[in-house]
């Protein structure tokens, strides 16, 4: 569950889900289910339209609570239109595992909660080398925090 409490919910850095999942072929989707209404003020998910067409982008440590990675080249993202879908409780967003997305902090008096379910192609496999490199990156971040 993704929880952004009223007035204190933290931002989620821009990222691609498949950077975490490492699904070969990237045939994977996220279903984001709104548990209450969501808009720009309470930190709705935002999307960079068309960003999924460029494969997995370089990520780096974000050092953000609850999110370990972020897109490295933020200038690259400036070429895309950013969408801020407004949702009501029960609405569902479906996005591809390569689409760049994130969310801003919650500055409103309303909580923003969402539940996600991920699906992948039944023939999908995992990129074990990517997983190994990601684990190394996580270990470096942990060492820097100690």
Short names for language-model regions:
Residues 9-84, 124-131:
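Catalytic core of non-heme Fe(II) oxygenases with the double-stranded beta-helix
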Residues 58-63, 89-94, 98-146:
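Non-heme Fe(II)/2-oxoglutarate
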Residues 1-6:
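Active-site cores enriched in adjacent His and Asp/Glu residues with nearby glycine-rich loops
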Residues 7-8, 106:
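Short Asp/Glu-rich motifs
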């Amino acid at each position: 569950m993704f929880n952004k409490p009223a007035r204190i919910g933290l931002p989620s850095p821009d990222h691609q889900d498949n950077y975490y999942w490492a699904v070969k072929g990237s045939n994977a989707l996220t279903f984001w289910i709104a548990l209450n209404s969501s808009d720009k003020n309470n930190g709705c998910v935002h999307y960079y339209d068309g960003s999924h067409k460029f494969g997995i982008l370089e990520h780096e440590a974000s050092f953000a609570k609850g999110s370990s990675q972020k897109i490295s080249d933020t200038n690259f993202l400036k070429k895309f239109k950013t969408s801020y879908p407004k949702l009501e409780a029960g609405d569902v967003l479906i996005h591809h595992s390569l689409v760049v997305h994130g969310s801003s902090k919650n500055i409103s008096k309303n909580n923003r909660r969402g539940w996600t379910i991920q699906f992948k192609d039944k023939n999908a496999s995992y990129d074990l080398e990517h997983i190994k490199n990601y684990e190394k990156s996580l270990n470096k971040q942990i060492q820097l925090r100690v």
